[in-house]
């Protein structure tokens, strides 16, 4: 492919090796995946990728900045700021569809990045609220529904079912249980956006109202 993208098969081998080693050393009784919120996976009706998972630092979406700005929802609808490159997932989709006119028709379902790995572990496709609500332009948090952008892009019916991070996607697939030594009844949770994951302990443990001053995703 001509665009910058993730080597998901190498990541998959790394993940399986990590699960195998962790199971051997400590044991695993549940799995949840957390990632950044600026990538998305397009799957066909067999659950396979129909396009590479775009690196959010790829500048391709900047090529259609004016056109995209004309269709993206207002901040008052989504709470998403307008960000450069592929940091708005909606811009990624718009750019990818403009580059490949057949891509939308090939796409059966769209999943957020943590849930792509959850899908590979379980075979179940979903999106989660924290990832879809993370500056994607695709989520209306006030109405708790897909934003108007999805309809404009013609993907409302393609975005996989949106569930909570604590919901269970399913159990690991038998072949993964065999490869890793993990119990085949091990649940895989939906997964969560990384910055929301770092906020969650405060939400759970802090009584009453509070403020968190965060550096964002990365801390050095």
PLM regions and their residue ranges:
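Short, hydrophobic/amphipathic alpha-helical packing segments
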Residues: 12-20, 90-93, 193-200
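Residues that line or immediately flank small-molecule/substrate-binding pockets and catalytic motifs
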Residues: 35, 57, 166
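N-terminal glycine/serine-rich phosphate-binding loop of ATP-dependent small-molecule kinases
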Residues: 1-52, 106, 161, 177-190
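Residue-level signal for inorganic ion chemistry
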Residues: 31, 58, 96
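Gly/Ser/Thr-rich active-site cleft segment
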Residues: 76-193
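Glycine-rich phosphate-binding loop of actin/hexokinase-like ATP-binding domains
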Residues: 40-45, 49-68, 107, 111-146, ...
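Conserved FAD-binding subdomain of flavin-dependent enzymes
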Residues: 22, 60, 70-74
């Amino acid at each position: 492919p001509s665009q910058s993208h993730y080597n998901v098969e190498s990541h998959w081998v790394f993940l399986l090796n990590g699960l195998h080693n962790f199971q051997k050393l400590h044991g695993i009784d549940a799995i949840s995946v957390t990632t950044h919120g600026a990538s998305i996976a397009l799957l066909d009706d067999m659950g396979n990728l129909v396009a590479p998972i775009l690196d959010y630092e790829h500048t391709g979406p900047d090529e259609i900045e004016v056109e995209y700005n004309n269709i993206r929802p207002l901040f008052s609808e989504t709470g998403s700021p307008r960000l450069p490159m592929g940091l708005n997932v909606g811009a990624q989709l718009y750019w990818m569809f403009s580059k490949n006119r057949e891509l939308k028709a090939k796409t059966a379902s769209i999943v957020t990045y943590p849930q792509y790995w959850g899908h590979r572990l379980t075979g179940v496709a979903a999106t989660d609220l924290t990832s879809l609500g993370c500056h994607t332009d695709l989520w209306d948090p006030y109405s708790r529904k897909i934003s108007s952008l999805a309809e404009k892009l013609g993907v409302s019916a393609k975005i996989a079912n949106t569930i909570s991070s604590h919901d269970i996607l399913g159990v690991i697939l038998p072949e993964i249980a065999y490869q890793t030594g993990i119990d085949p009844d091990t649940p895989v949770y939906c997964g969560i956006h990384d910055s929301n994951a770092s906020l969650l302990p405060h939400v759970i443990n802090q009584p009453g109202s509070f403020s968190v001053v965060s550096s964002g995703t990365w801390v050095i």
